[in-house]
Amino acid sequence: IGGSVEGDLVKAEIISHEKNYYTAKLIEIIEESEYRITPECANFSLCGGCTLGNINFEYENKIKKQTVVSAFRRAGLDYAIVGDTLHTDERKHYRNNITLHYNGGKFGYYAEKTNVAVDFGKCLLCPASYYAVADYVNAHVSDIGMFAPSDMHIRDNSAGDITVSIYTGKKVPE
């Protein structure tokens, strides 16, 4: 159930039924899980960037390991070899690359399950230096020329060097 956390007691509406599972829409959280936290990001409910921002750090790492184990199991591989998740102790500003999408005259993250870019804002996942890059490109995106931008990839290395790649799509109509 999207928006719920394991251990939540919820009221939900079933919206589809497949052979091996149901899909439901969250109506109300009646009792919160012990794993649930208040997301620090103001855009958490809008943005598809930080899907695990509403659970505590220990549980986040447990889910990540379970995801890998599940993928190994489905592929018929030995999942016993999957170790604990390697992670940074920092939950903020740890990303060294992001992809932003162009929509509505600016770059941003896609809203969850859509192709609509939402305000990049002050994303807590990436370094603060990325904000200046995104702000600059958004202010000058009309200067790119005759091709419409589609995506922007920002990456940095341990020395702090930043690489920006802007991908273009269709030709802008004249």
Explain the meaning of each model-derived region.
Residues 1-174:
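Accessory RNA-recognition modules of RNA-modification enzymes
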